[in-house]
């Protein structure tokens, strides 16, 4: 008998683009900055250009990194920039039951195992000469056949099947990654009980019905993992687009909260939007208001990324 998909109710018919659902998923570790606005604007424009929905998700699954009040600041910034979202906000910190359900489904099929390795041990493993993803060494599978004597699980990992994952990025073109070789079995839950980002994102995208993920290029390395995990859960993968990062000219580092990027000056929303538009490689638009700018930008976006009809309906305002 064929195996039933774990979350089959979330399968999406990509032939019907009326069903477009995008999302913006900031982590509340600080306010939005110029780099995060580029990703927010691109995802908003793609949703509006496809006459779709734009969801907001607060990715506060890593509670120790959450800054009190930051989520409210982010929402206020989006409103000031006229980037209004559709429907209710999803909070990862309230989604433990959904993550547990997916985790249990994988565990029931023998796809989860406990790992007692420390980060140092993984870095010093026999595979230390192997190039990894995002600066991390691939997990060598030390605990795949069972924990060493005297060890307790520090994390729970998913068994990654062999093979190369291929996909087409709507901005960057064809991509591929051998997840088993480049990453290895990756963690879905930490010893402190916190859920890993990769599991949370896959489950949340499915539950929100997301058809298209538009985000910064720094997350490109996560895409193959998320596709593999989604397939193990019986989920159809969303289309992806990874847009350029904004770099600090003084340091050469990407603008990020960790690197001290300043918060957006939302008292000048039109100027902020124009700068983000420029960061996406577009020429400045002649617009006197944020609303006029967004209307014109969505029309150009539609022309560039395949929509024949550039007229964009006004988006509903969030509560």
Swiss-Prot record:
Protein known as: Glutamyl-Q tRNA(Asp) synthetase
Binding positions for Zn(2+) per the UniProt entry: 115, 117, 139, 143
Any one biological process term the GO annotation gives: glutamyl-tRNA aminoacylation
Cofactor note: Binds 1 zinc ion per subunit.
Family, per entry: Belongs to the class-I aminoacyl-tRNA synthetase family. GluQ subfamily.
Motif ('HIGH' region): 26-36
Enzyme class: ligase
Annotated Gene3D superfamilies: HUPs
Any single Pfam family the record assigns to this protein: tRNA-synt_1c
GO molecular function, one term: zinc ion binding
EC number of this enzyme: 6.1.1.-
List of residues binding ATP: 257
Gene: gluQ
InterPro entries, alphabetized: Glu-Q_tRNA(Asp)_Synthase, Glu/Gln-tRNA-synth, Glu/Gln-tRNA-synth_Ib_cat-dom, GluQ/Sye, Rossmann-like_a/b/a_fold
Keyword terms of this UniProt record: Aminoacyl-tRNA synthetase, ATP-binding, Ligase, Metal-binding, Nucleotide-binding, Zinc
Role description: Catalyzes the tRNA-independent activation of glutamate in presence of ATP and the subsequent transfer of glutamate onto a tRNA(Asp). Glutamate is transferred on the 2-amino-5-(4,5-dihydroxy-2-cyclopenten-1-yl) moiety of the queuosine in the wobble position of the QUC anticodon.
Motif ('KMSKS' region): 254-258
